[in-house]
């Protein structure tokens, strides 16, 4: 930052979640430095906050090996061009938002040119391919981490890291309104309610839906009034789920929802879900849960050898113990899933204790992440 020009921040976001984070960061920085300039790779939200887009975010938003290989030449061209243009611009700080396969190499290129670099959102280095931490350490001046155990991991390897809390924890209330959520979904206040969330990817929905539906059938025998809500992320997943349901449980009445995962969690007495971000969101919704997950046998065999953590779900990683039951692979079958869910639907001591711990964990990661991230950027820009 010099007298001649405003604070200049370069950013690269590669997908919608990064665009949301980038927009929140830009908003928080503009409150402190109104004339700051923002340039880079941005989605519509970042652009709405005033970020000048040298490339559209969609250019980087490719998933799957085949898709990446098909776009590889273009991706390499974009990275080389950004390395050159950011090198000429000399921004006060570069912030790579998630998209580690693209951003960490770019961060390393820029750091060699004397540009300060931040990687916002830690890759899951604490879980697998842990040696990536050394590459991240060489490429960045600072990592911004959502979760406290991530910072503890970086500290172990002397890689500068700041725990800023989780934006989702900031966005969700400490005490969600269950009755309001039930009003929205048309669920009676006095009914038992179960949310089924079989994942957002096609492979997950294919692997888990049948067992989740059979579990719901078993639970309905104990709770005849059981309302079952199934939020699905898009029309393709809904169509896939409906096909599986027609084959497995055609007579089971359920509420199929387009999106509305958060409302379903808040409204429910218990949830059965695939692991991933949904488990964190469910914890923040204060909905007691069971995690069920299944993958192809070879993939599971490989994962067991690569993954270095005792648990797969974020609530358990945050708690440092099995707070939430995880039933994986052969264990992920209807009888065991139903047995784990029954005490949660009873809404007694087990679910109350889980709810209280969820609230404590929510408070731990509710730190106003946008503000914390902005503060970290400004400190590095000094």
Swiss-Prot record:
- Ranges in coiled-coil conformation: none
Entry keyword set: Glycosyltransferase, Lipid A biosynthesis, Lipid biosynthesis, Lipid metabolism, Transferase
- What's one GO-annotated cellular component? membrane
Which Gene Ontology BP terms does the record give?
Answer: lipid A biosynthetic process
The keyword Transcription regulation is annotated on this UniProt entry:
no
Q: Which superkingdom does the taxonomy of this entry point to? A: Bacteria
Could you confirm whether the keyword Transferase appears in this record? yes
Q: Give the E.C. number(s).
A: 2.4.1.182
Q: In which pathway does it act?
A: Glycolipid biosynthesis; lipid IV(A) biosynthesis; lipid IV(A) from (3R)-3-hydroxytetradecanoyl-[acyl-carrier-protein] and UDP-N-acetyl-alpha-D-glucosamine: step 5/6
Q: Which Pfam families match?
A: LpxB
Major enzyme class: transferase
Q: Which GO terms describe its molecular function?
A: lipid-A-disaccharide synthase activity; phospholipid binding
Recorded catalytic reaction(s): these are: 2-N,3-O-bis[(3R)-3-hydroxytetradecanoyl]-alpha-D-glucosaminyl 1-phosphate + UDP-2-N,3-O-bis[(3R)-3-hydroxytetradecanoyl]-alpha-D-glucosamine = lipid A disaccharide (E. coli) + UDP + H(+); a lipid X + a UDP-2-N,3-O-bis[(3R)-3-hydroxyacyl]-alpha-D-glucosamine = a lipid A disaccharide + UDP + H(+)
Function summary: Condensation of UDP-2,3-diacylglucosamine and 2,3-diacylglucosamine-1-phosphate to form lipid A disaccharide, a precursor of lipid A, a phosphorylated glycolipid that anchors the lipopolysaccharide to the outer membrane of the cell.
Q: Which family does it belong to?
A: Belongs to the LpxB family.
Which PANTHER family does the entry link to? LIPID-A-DISACCHARIDE SYNTHASE, LIPID-A-DISACCHARIDE SYNTHASE, MITOCHONDRIAL-RELATED
NCBIfam families registered for this protein in UniProt: lpxB (TIGR00215)
Q: What is this protein called?
A: Lipid-A-disaccharide synthase
Q: Which lineage ranks, top first, belong to the organism behind this chain?
A: Bacteria, Pseudomonadati, Pseudomonadota, Gammaproteobacteria, Enterobacterales
């Amino acid at each position: 930052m010099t007298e001649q020009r405003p604070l200049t921040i370069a950013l690269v976001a590669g997908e919608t979640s990064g665009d949301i984070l980038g927009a929140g960061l830009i908003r928080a920085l503009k409150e402190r430095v109104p004339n700051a300039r923002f340039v880079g790779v941005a989605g519509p939200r970042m652009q709405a906050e005033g970020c000048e887009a040298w490339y559209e975010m969609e250019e980087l938003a490719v998933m799957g090996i085949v898709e990446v290989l098909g776009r590889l030449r273009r991706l390499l061209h974009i990275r080389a061009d950004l390395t050159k243009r950011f090198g000429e611009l000399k921004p006060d700080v570069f912030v790579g938002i998630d998209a580690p396969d693209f951003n960490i190499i770019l961060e390393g290129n820029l750091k060699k040119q004397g540009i300060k670099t931040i990687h916002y959102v830690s890759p899951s280095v604490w879980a697998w391919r842990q040696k990536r931490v050394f590459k991240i350490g060489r490429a960045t001046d600072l990592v911004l981490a959502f979760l406290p155990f991530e910072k503890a991991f970086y500290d172990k390897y002397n890689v500068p890291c700041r725990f800023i809390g989780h934006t989702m924890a900031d966005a969700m209330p400490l005490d969600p309104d269950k009755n309001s959520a039930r009003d929205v979904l048309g669920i009676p206040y006095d009914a038992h309610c179960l949310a089924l969330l079989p994942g957002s990817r096609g492979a997950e929905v294919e692997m888990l839906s049948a067992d989740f539906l059979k579990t719901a059938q078993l639970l309905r025998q104990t709770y005849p009034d059981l309302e079952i809500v199934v939020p699905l992320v898009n029309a393709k997943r809904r169509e896939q789920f409906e096909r599986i349901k027609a084959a497995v449980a055609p007579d089971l009445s359920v509420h199929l929802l387009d999106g509305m995962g958060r409302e379903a969690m808040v409204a429910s007495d218990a949830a059965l879900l695939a692991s991933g971000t949904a488990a964190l969101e469910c914890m923040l919704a204060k909905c007691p849960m069971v995690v069920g997950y299944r993958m192809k046998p070879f993939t599971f065999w490989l994962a067991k050898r690569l993954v270095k953590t005792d648990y797969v779900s974020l609530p358990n990683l945050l708690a440092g113990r099995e707070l939430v039951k995880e039933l994986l692979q052969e264990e992920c079958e209807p009888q065991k899933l139903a047995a784990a869910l029954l005490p949660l639907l009873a809404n007694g001591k087990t679910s109350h204790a889980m709810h209280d711990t969820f609230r404590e964990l929510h408070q731990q990661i509710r730190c106003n992440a946008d503000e914390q991230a902005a503060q970290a950027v400004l400190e590095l820009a000094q």
